[in-house]
């Protein structure tokens, strides 16, 4: 009977969001999302405008997904609660789930590529990604791919053929480390909210239904920021792991100067850093670091040989760099 034509489709997630009455809400009197933000961060939306806007975007986007309108949602994100152990990050995940949807959550997700994980995208309201700080770089790459999926095609248990499942789940991550991400380029999918100390007595006074009702209202009226990649990249920079190439270039050797009059290839820079710092770096990491720091790369002929070179002002002389290549 499970897969017969007599089985009636029941969508608990959509039914819940359809039942949220937003007819009495107006933009002036909304405050539940702001109250939630203040209760978990200790800051107002005016004190941390970027953090509030990115958090609001996650709630509104997930309201759209829950209404079955994922194709209208431009970008998909994972909201992450960052804070010391014991601040209640995992409990916040459970708070975000309305009582009628308690059976539609998944915790302890570890394998980002197996069949059950992909099916869970179409069957759950929220998925917890606990302790992201312990994830490897390879795992985070797989996770970013999972976060961006809008639909999956898999064969459910007892089914005879594959089924296309539209994404329903939202991702909630937690971590306590301050260095989690390997690079800024792929971090825009993560919305990090720093948790100081959750005031649970006050949070209990904020009905989760009212928060999701506001999120639905803002989503339906397009009253949220749909382009937060830049804000995410800026916000998440402090959670990036130490980059040896960035440190060597930024702190020890070269300063950004738009009027720089010296030109060096990534290989020349590599040779000098390795000699002076006694660390081995590849030209790819050096190139990425130079580009991230804004150094201009131009075609420049030296001694009759035209190569792509970085325009810089060096804190060491040309002869010192030339000597390091010997």
Feature names for model-found ranges:
Residues 117-122, 156-174:
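AAA+/SF3 P-loop NTPase mechanochemical coupling elements
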Residues 125-148, 181-186:
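Conserved AAA+/SF3 P-loop NTPase catalytic/coupling segment centered on the Walker-B
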Residues 140-163:
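Conserved catalytic/switch belt of AAA+ P-loop NTPases
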Residues 181-200:
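A short helix-turn-beta junction within AAA+ P-loop NTPase domains corresponding to the substrate/partner-engaging
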Residues 204-237:
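Long, low-complexity, charged/polar intrinsically disordered regions in eukaryotic proteins
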